[in-house]
C-alpha cells in the first residue's frame, strides 16, 4: 500500500512543482482548507507544494530538513529517463545524502551497501528502500510533531480566518461592547 501511494505521488507531480527556488507554489494562492488535507496524511502534505514548503520550514528548525530533501530528490530521480542524467543524479544523491562525507547525511540502514560502483549502473528504484525508510521516519516522527507545531497551527488559523471572516452582526456586537464600556 505504501509503495502504491509513493508511486501515485511520483506520477501526479512534475519535479518543477517541488523544486521552486523558494519552495512556494506557482499558483500563489492555495485551495481552501489545505491544512485539513495536510493533516489527513503525509502523502497529501507532500503532494502540495505549499505543504512541502511549510514542512521544510518545520524540519529546518528541527535540524532534519535533509530527510524531506532526500525524499524529494528520490522522487525526482525516479522520473528521470535519460541514463546519463540518471547517473549524474544518482551520484549527487549519494554524495549529498548517503556517503560518509555527505553534507546532508540521512540516517538510514543500508546506505553503506550503495557504493560509487553501483551508481555507475543506476535504475529508477535503486533508492526506493532508503526512501521508504525516510518516509516512515518522517511519517511516524516529524510529521506528527509538525501537526502540533506552532507553524502548522498558525497556518491553519490564518486559513480559517480567511475562509470565515466575522459576519457583520458579530462585528457590530463587538463594536457596541467597546463603545459602551
From Swiss-Prot:
Pfam families: RGS. Residues 1-35, 157-181 are annotated as: Disordered. One of its GO terms (molecular function) is G-protein alpha-subunit binding. Disulfide bonds: none annotated. The keyword Signal does not apply. One of its GO terms (biological process) is negative regulation of signal transduction. A lipid is attached at residue 74 (S-palmitoyl cysteine). It is found in: Cytoplasm, Cytosol; Nucleus. Keywords: Cytoplasm, GTPase activation, Lipoprotein, Nucleus, Palmitate, Phosphoprotein, Signal transduction inhibitor. GO terms for cellular component: axon terminus; cytosol; dendritic spine; neuronal cell body; nucleus. Gene3D superfamilies: 1.10.196.10, Regulator of G-protein Signalling 4, domain 2. Residues 41-156 form the RGS domain. InterPro entries: RGS, RGS10/12/14-like, RGS10_RGS, RGS_sf, RGS_subdom1/3, RGS_subdomain_2. The modification Phosphoserine is found at residues 24, 41, 176. The keyword Heme does not apply. Regulates G protein-coupled receptor signaling cascades, including signaling downstream of the muscarinic acetylcholine receptor CHRM2. Inhibits signal transduction by increasing the GTPase activity of G protein alpha subunits, thereby driving them into their inactive GDP-bound form. Modulates the activity of potassium channels that are activated in response to CHRM2 signaling. Activity on GNAZ is inhibited by palmitoylation of the G-protein. Interacts with GNAZ, GNAI1 and GNAI3. Associates specifically with the activated, GTP-bound forms of GNAZ and GNAI3. This is Regulator of G-protein signaling 10. It comes from Rattus norvegicus (Rat). The gene is Rgs10.
Amino acid at each position: 500500500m505504501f509503495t502504491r501511494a509513493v508511486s501515485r505521488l511520483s506520477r501526479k507531480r512534475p519535479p518543477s512543482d517541488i523544486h521552486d527556488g523558494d519552495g512556494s507554489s506557482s499558483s500563489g494562492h492555495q485551495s481552501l482548507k489545505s491544512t485539513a488535507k495536510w493533516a489527513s496524511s503525509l502523502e497529501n502534505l507532500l503532494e502540495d507544494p505549499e505543504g512541502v514548503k511549510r514542512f521544510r520550514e518545520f524540519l529546518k528548525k528541527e535540524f532534519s530538513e535533509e530527510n524531506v530533501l532526500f525524499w524529494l530528490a528520490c522522487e525526482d530521480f525516479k522520473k528521470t529517463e535519460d541514463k546519463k542524467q540518471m547517473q549524474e543524479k544518482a551520484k549527487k544523491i549519494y554524495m549529498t545524502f548517503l556517503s560518509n562525507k555527505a553534507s546532508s547525511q540521512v540516517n538510514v540502514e543500508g546506505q553503506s551497501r550503495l557504493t560509487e560502483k553501483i551508481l555507475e549502473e543506476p535504475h529508477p528504484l535503486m533508492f526506493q528502500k532508503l526512501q521508504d525508510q525516510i518516509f516512515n521516519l518522517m511519517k511516524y516522527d516529524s510529521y506528527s510533531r509538525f501537526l502540533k507545531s506552532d507553524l502548522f497551527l498558525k497556518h491553519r488559523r490564518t486559513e480559517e480566518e480567511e475562509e470565515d471572516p466575522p459576519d457583520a452582526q458579530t462585528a457590530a456586537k463587538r463594536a457596541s461592547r467597546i463603545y459602551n464600556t
